[in-house]
Amino acid sequence: GVTVYKTTPEEFAEVGAKLIEEGVSIIGGCCGTTPAHIKALADKVKPMGIHHAEAPRRRVLTSERKTVEIDLDGPFMVIGERINPTGKKKLQAELREGSLNMVRDMARAQEENGAAILDVNMGMNGIDEKQMMLNTIHEVTYTVDCPLCIDSSHVDIIEAALRIYPGRALINSISLEKEKFEKLLPIAKKYGAMFILLPLSDEGLPKDAEEKRQIVRTILDAALKIGLHKEDIIVDGLVATVGANPLAALECFDTIQYCKDELSLATACGLSNISFGLPERIYVNSAFLTIAIANPSQDLLMNAAVASDMLLHKEGSDIRYINRMNQRAQKEAPATDNAASAGTLEPANPVFDCVLKGNKGNILKE
């Protein structure tokens, strides 16, 4: 048979004009339209006033299957940072063998424990870091729904990762170190990525809060100049350990408040830095929690975060709190089967569980 399109150019143009009247600002043709249809449409709507609606800009990260919005007044969010071989000998050994089983497990555990975004870092000796980063992005995006944060000290690795990432990623990070700064900003623009602004320069750590503010303004101005927007930026509060600098927390708080109130910028910080070298770090971390990037593998921190959101009446926080406590109760409920009484709880069908969770590496073992 032959497909027939009966709409004439004149009829097509009339419909287009009605769309413009209703507020549509972009129109065109598809199957069945010819150059005559497009010319008639253009002639018809050219004299009409086009309504250009300015949609509010939003801080949004995406994966293949999930969108995460970062709102200045929204609930606390966690960036999971466990996928990093630094200090993890077992993970390093697996990566040298080309295995990503631990990476998949870490990704899944962090997502299940409340992480909204997952940081991915493959920086270690003895591997092809770029190829391992690409392999990891493929496996992690297959395993979990969370958007990813691409973390590398090498510009070419960040760009290669952004090129294949199926969504809008977060770059960790862009500082005022000239060699990287001049390359990474255009890369963020090219791939439409958000980025973490790290207030460091070639001179090293800023000596005080004012120097930190100046670095933030310098990077912000450069980003705006090339067409990026404030909503594309998350400022790292640059937390130092309070054991070495008694003013570390206050300086971080100052940076966060300045960025939010004066510059309308989102902020983040590495929670564990504040308590480095101190005993019973959990208490220091908990006190710092509301402005922190936490390790979502620690239930106590995540439970405190969800409870804090509820007390501050953040949108949807009551439901999140109830759901989380229900999940916690289910995890802690006494098991009745033989495996549980023996101290281990195995899935009824391990192979099915591996397939369901995309854990290809363990299927043969089962």
Segments predicted by a language model, with ranges:
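Domain-level signal for soluble alpha/beta catalytic cores
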Residues: G1-D236, A240-E366
